[in-house]
Amino acid sequence: MKIAIVCYPTFGGSGVVATELGLELAKRGHEIHFITYSQPVRLALLNPNVHNHEVHVPEYPLFHYQPYELALSSKLVDMVKLYKIDVLHVHYAIPHAYAGYMAKQMLADEGIHIPMVTTLHGTDITLVGNHPFYKPAVSFSINKSDVVTSVSQSLKDDTYRLFDIKNEIDVIPNFIELNKDKLKENIPCHRSLMAPDNEKIITHISNFRKVKRIDDIVRIFFEIQKEVPSKLMMVGEGPEKEGAEQLCEQLGIQNKVIFFGNSNEIDKILCFSDLFLLPSETESFGLAAL
């Protein structure tokens, strides 16, 4: 099959899962086309079955915000026609499901009928999508999808509770590639680079958004380090990072906390760790913990 995958190209769980899914499908002989605004961070190498198409949004002074959704819809139409795509798989409802629906309608006017699968990942439903400004469009685009999946039963339940959804939602949990991890088992873990043997290493990995309760992680570590010699490794980028750095300074623990930024070498970081913290307010799946 020829499959177009629409996702965010960032380090967030939805983008990571979408990219890994595409790579696994490519290994099985399917032709995969990623369509997004930049190359996905987990798409290190392209192969004959994997293609990446960037969506370019022309700058125009009239627009206060550039119309990415329109550009994405048009790009989908072009790619479906050019590569004879069999199915669209859009990850994260906003704005991908709506853009996918618009593309379907434009293609239908030309006699091209293509099914669309929408995968719901979490905050596209429970936070952003539930906002009154977006809710009608999100509900509409989900109901217009040919197949809808969610990454957990709890997210499926939340979707039915928060939206007027008529479609059946299939639960397909997120995954990690175990064979890849087995290949990395022989990679040496240089823990001594992070902390001496008598110190414990606490780790947190996320997109540093409010729902992840970043300040609580710092405060939890503040109490831990009083009782146990330890260091905290904070991996990721996001709006709450600067506040967390300031809190570390206020508590006088800045020399015990390491902020890594985004990383593609999570396996190496986790091999250092004695404890992983994920005290999120809510998680639809929690891929980092898996």
Q: What kind of region is each of these model predictions?
A:
Residues A108-V117, T123-S141, D157:
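Nucleotide-sugar donor phosphate/pyrophosphate-binding loop at the beta->alpha transition
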Residues D181-P196:
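A short helix/loop element that forms part of the nucleotide-sugar donor recognition site in Leloir-type
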Residues N264-S273:
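Short acidic alpha-helix that forms the nucleotide-activated donor recognition element
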Residues P61-L88, A97-M102, P132-P136, F140, ...:
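An amphipathic, basic-hydrophobic alpha-helix
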Residues C7-F11, L23-Y68:
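N-terminal strand-loop element at the rim of the active site
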Residues S154, F175:
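Carbohydrate-associated surface elements
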Residues N262, E281:
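Aromatic "clamp/platform" in nucleotide-sugar-dependent glycosyltransferases that forms part
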Residues P196-T203, I214-F259:
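A conserved nucleotide-sugar
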